[in-house]
Amino acid sequence: MAAAAGIWYALALPALPTVLLGVTAFNLLVGTTEAMWRLYGWRTPNAGEQIAWPDPVPPGREQLAFDLIVPLRDEANVIVDTLHGLMRQSHPRYRIVVSLCDNDESTIEAVRAVVRENLHDNVQRTIRDNRITVIVDHYANPTKAQQLNRALEVCMGDVIGVIDAEDDVAEDLLVHTEALFERTGADVVQGGVQLMNLGRGLDKWFQVHNVLEYFFWFTSRMAFHADSGFVPLGGNTVFVRRGLLEEAGGWPLSITEDCALGVQLSAEFGAKVATAYSAALTTREEVPPSIFNKKVGSLFWQRDRWVRGFLQEFIAGRWLKMPTLRQKALAGYILATPILQALSFILVPTAIIVGLTVPTPIAVALLMFAPYITLGIIVCSQLIGLHDFCAQYGKRASRWHYASLIFLMPLYQLVLSGAAAVAVYKYAVGDNTWYKTGRLAEHRAMPAPEYESAA
C-alpha cells in the first residue's frame, strides 16, 4: 500500500485519470494476451512442426486398442451418419461405446438400426466383427459426465476417446493418434476440432465468428497451452490413457466436464498433453444454428454453460496445484479469460467516453485508444484466418463474411459478454440449470435422417 501511495503522489494525478490509466493497462493486458495466443502458431518458428500429426502407424504395427465413447441424448437426427463414419476407421483395434438414456427412445432406435445393419453386413460379407457396444441406463438428471463415466465402466481398451453426436471424424484419425502417443509418450492427445458452417443469410451472421474462434483455438492457442503444461481439454477428439483416466476417477461431474478433466489431469497428475492439427484429420462440427433459440441450439446458452464451467474451475482452485508460480498464474488467467474479456469489452468504450467527456490530461485521453491497437491486430488476424480456413477446407467465403468480421465483431462480442454476465449471475445465485445445444447437421452436405421412436 505504501508503494502504491508513493506512485500515486509521484505522478501527482487526480483520481479519475489514475483510474483511467489502470483501466487502459487492464484492457491492453487482455487484448495483448489474446493477440499473442491467436498468433502463437504464426510467430513461433517450430509451432507448425509442433502441432503436425506424425505419419500413421504402418498397417500391421498397431499396438493400442481404442474405446470411443459416444454419449447421446436426443440425437436421433444426427447419430446415424456419425456411427457410419466411425465404423470406417482404418485402425483395426477399436470399439464404439454408445452411452444412452433409457427414456430417449428415438435415439435408442436410431442406434439399434445401425447395430442391426452392421450385424447384417457382418453375416453377408464377413468384413469385421461388431464394433458397437450399446449402454442404456437411467439418469435422474442426465449429464454428459454421467454418461461418459457409465460407459467407462465397460471399457477395456488402452486409450479412451470421446466423440460427440454430430462429429464427422477422419477415417485415419486413430492410426495417426497412436503414432502421436508413440512419438511423444503423451498421457493425453487432443486432436483438432473445427466448426464448418460459415453461415448463409443475415440471421447466420455470427457463425463465421464462431468458426474462427475454433480455428485459432486449435491451430494456435491449444499448442500454447500444451507448452505451458496446463490444458483445458475440448469436449471431443480427446484421447486419454485408460489407466490415468481411471486413476483420476473418470470425468468430474461438472457442466464442462472436458475443461474440468483437463484441469485435474494437468494440476493433480502432471499429465503430458500432446496436440495436433491438420485439416485432413480434423473432426468437423457445426456452429449452433441460432443465437438464442434453445430448442434448435443456441450459441448464447452454450457459452453461458462454458463460462460457468471455467468459473467453477477457477473458484475451485485446483489450478493452484500447478508446480511453479508462473504456471499457477497462467492457469488462473486461462480459466478467468472469458470473464476478463467480457469485462474488457465493456471497459474499452466506457473508458474512452469518460476520457473524452470529462476533463483529463491530453496524454491520458490519447492513451485511452491504445487498446484499439491490439483490437486492430485481432481483426487483421481474423481476415487472414478466414482466408486460411477457406484454403484449407475448400470453402468459399463471401464479401459479406469478411465484412461481418470487421463491422459485426462488436455485436458478436456483445453476445459473448452477455452470456458471461448471465453465467456470473447464475453462479452467484446457485442456479445450476443449463441447456443442451441442439443439432441441425448444418455442417453436412445432406440432412441427417430422422427416426421416430418404436411403437
Annotate each language-model stretch with its function.
Residues 119-129, 135-136, 141-157, 171-255, ...:
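Long helical/loop segments within the catalytic core of UDP-sugar-dependent glycosyltransferases
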Residues 7-25, 38-41, 58, 334-429:
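Membrane-embedded multi-pass helical conduit in multi-pass membrane proteins
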Residues 255-261:
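Acidic donor-binding loop at a coil-to-helix junction in glycosyltransferase catalytic cores
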